[in-house]
C-alpha cells in the first residue's frame, strides 16, 4: 500500500510529461491501496490560497479540482497525525532536523507500513 506525497497529487492536476507517468502508475494500482496524509490536504489548500491571491480565476479552478476530486477521492483514505506519528516524527528529526511537514508524512508512512510515492 502507498502514501502519496503532495507533489504526486499536484502532478496529476498540472499535466505535462510528469502527468503521463503518474497516470500510468495510478492506472496500475487499486485506489484502495492509495492513501494521503492530512498534511497533504494542508499543503494543497495553502498552494491554492496562494494562487487565488495572484490569479482568482486560476485559483477558483484549482479550488474546484480540490473540492470535487481530491477531497471526495481520499475522504476515507486520509490519514491523520496521532501520538505515535508525532513521536516517530521527533525521532526522524534527530540528529538532522528536517521539514516538519515532510517528516510528518514520512512518519505517517512508517507507522502505517506504507511506501511513500513521490
For every predicted segment, state its role.
Residues 1-40, 50-67, 96:
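Short, well-structured N-terminal submotif of metal-dependent ribonuclease cores
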Residues 5, 43, 102:
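Acidic active-site catalytic centers that drive phospho-/nucleotidyl reactions
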Residues 46-51, 60, 64, 72-117:
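Active-site neighborhoods of divalent-metal-dependent phosphate/nucleic-acid chemistry enzymes
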Residues 11, 43, 111:
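Acidic-residue sensor for enzyme active/binding pockets
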Amino acid at each position: 500500500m502507498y502514501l502519496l506525497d503532495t507533489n504526486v497529487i499536484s502532478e496529476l492536476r498540472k499535466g505535462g510529461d510528469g502527468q503521463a507517468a503518474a497516470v500510468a502508475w495510478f492506472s496500475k494500482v487499486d485506489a484502495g491501496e492509495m492513501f494521503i496524509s492530512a498534511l497533504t490536504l494542508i499543503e494543497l489548500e495553502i498552494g491554492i490560497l496562494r494562487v487565488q491571491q495572484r490569479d482568482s480565476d486560476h485559483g477558483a479552478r484549482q479550488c474546484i479540482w480540490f473540492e470535487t476530486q481530491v477531497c471526495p477521492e481520499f475522504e476515507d483514505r486520509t490519514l491523520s497525525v496521532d501520538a505515535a506519528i508525532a513521536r516517530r516524527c521527533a525521532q526522524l528529526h534527530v540528529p538532522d532536523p528536517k521539514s516538519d511537514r515532510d517528516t510528518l508524512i514520512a512518519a505517517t508512512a512508517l507507522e502505517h507500513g506504507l511506501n511513500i510515492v513521490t
